[in-house]
Amino acid sequence: MSSPLKSPPDTIAIEAKGVHVSIAGHAILKGVDLQIPAGQVVALIGPNGSGKTTLLRAFLGLQTIDSGSIHIFGKPVGVDALAAVAYVPQKLALEPSFALSVREFLALATHRTKNWFWRKHQDIDRSLGAVIEEVQIAPLLSKPLGKLSGGQFQRVVLAFALLRNPKLLLLDEPTAGVDAPGEHTFYELIGEHQRRRGLTVVLVSHDLSMVYRHAARVYALNGTICCEGRPEDVMNAESLKRAYGIQVSPYQHHHHSGHDHAHPHSHGHVH
């Protein structure tokens, strides 16, 4: 829990008030109000088209809002506020021939990148510090990015994000297309870093069973915040039907379907 000695902005990682966003004349966010507490793993859930990624982009300053306000640790979204933020997207589509190595890619994340191409590998590795060990990618450093598996690539992107020493980590479907062992490893690493660094982690995911296991707080979005609270309070039949418009189970995995609503199928987990 946050110390009572901390200033109030430090206890709220993200505050959104009355956020409206329309894209191509279509209202996506319709007055979103939320406060995300600092130092927790929280999740945004909701059907396709509910505005989850749009809201995440607004947090990053990549999506202009029509009205309302967003503050990150008490500062309006902008250069100062975003210095504390790192982002892990869905898996990027890279050609297998993409030749930049993991080591070279991560060197770009450090502030000591001048002439990095000519530096010795051991010097680069030293500058990357403990992150390469913490994220379990030391054996991958010489591998081209284009040759990595989905799970390996997401661990590399996580390392890139953590090298910024963020206070807030935003994850947009970070394990989409990653196999079950890779997904498990990724979220175990997220949990370890959240606890070690006191990070605030905001996760967008369709995988409700994973959200139930890892999030301390859940926000169900469908244009507005339908409900929020602890997973056991939000992820019940009534609340999920309100968010998704159909009957879904909190123990199921929801894939992108390209339609307005997610289509559930069993994820194979029993709680």
Model-derived regions: residue spans:
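Catalytic Walker B motif of ABC-type/P-loop ATPase nucleotide-binding domains
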Residues: 169-173
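The feature captures the beta-strand-to-loop junction immediately N-terminal to the Walker
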Residues: 45-47
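Conserved ABC ATPase signature
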Residues: 144-148
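H-loop/switch region of ABC-family ATPase nucleotide-binding domains
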Residues: 205-206
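Helix-to-loop junction immediately C-terminal to a conserved catalytic motif
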Residues: 60
